[in-house]
Amino acid sequence: MRIDIVTIFPACLDPLRQSLPGKAIESGLVDLNVHDLRRWTHDVHHSVDDAPYGGGPGMVMKAPVWGEALDEICSSETLLIVPTPAGVLFTQATAQRWTTESHLVFACGRYEGIDQRVVQDAARRMRVEEVSIGDYVLPGGESAAVVMVEAVLRLLAGVLGNPASHQDDSHSTGLDGLLEGPSYTRPASWRGLDVPEVLLSGDHARIAAWRREVSLQRTRERRPDLSHPD
């Protein structure tokens, strides 16, 4: 998989060189490239924004600069992802779907966003998805891009040491979209708090039933919108 990220703050993407994403890059499982949008500017000030038509606060990122950048980086096989609080909600299912893509490009906006014509123009040549990571607003799309890239990479074969590690994660299909229950490790007793007895029993059927029940309970309490009929 190839991933390109376009931004005016390349250093914001440095966390992707660490931990599991970093290992995926080093091992060749993913080809990650971060591009400074200002490279495609032509004025002495390297301007990437201008005042919005119709008035209003803030600045809007200019279409010509973004157009040149995407023309050079993208192809008809690209899935262009535009992080925006006005986008469709990013979920585990989204991350899973993107693992089948060969080329992801993230266009990280700033200020009041990117001129909408950039999205419209790109959609004539490739697939485009405007995506939000939650009902809140960030200064730019870089943090959202890091979140989404990490979510996708950990699902790629060979990234996690144990391929089964993500199969029973919260929101995963292996858990029917529910929240994962609590985890425990040694010691069995700590500061007067004991690990649930069932987890020490060695009875795999009982353990599976217990995990299912606490998963359902946690989901009902914390995310009733995800509640499961059983």
UniProtKB/Swiss-Prot annotation:
S-adenosyl-L-methionine binds at G109, I133, G134, D135, Y136, V137, L138. Keywords: Cytoplasm, Methyltransferase, S-adenosyl-L-methionine, Transferase, tRNA processing. It is found in: Cytoplasm. InterPro entries: Alpha/beta_knot_MTases, tRNA_m1G_MeTrfase_C_sf, tRNA_m1G_MeTrfase_TrmD, tRNA_m1G_MTases_N, tRNA_MeTrfase_TRMD/TRM10. It holds the Pfam family tRNA_m1G_MT. GO terms for cellular component: cytosol. SUPFAM superfamilies: alpha/beta knot. It catalyses: guanosine(37) in tRNA + S-adenosyl-L-methionine = N(1)-methylguanosine(37) in tRNA + S-adenosyl-L-homocysteine + H(+). Gene3D superfamilies: 3.40.1280.10, tRNA(m1g37)methyltransferase, domain 2. GO terms for biological process: tRNA N1-guanine methylation. The keyword Flavoprotein does not apply. Homodimer. Belongs to the RNA methyltransferase TrmD family. NCBIfam families: PRK00026.1, trmD. PANTHER family: TRNA (GUANINE-N(1)-)-METHYLTRANSFERASE. This is tRNA (guanine-N(1)-)-methyltransferase.
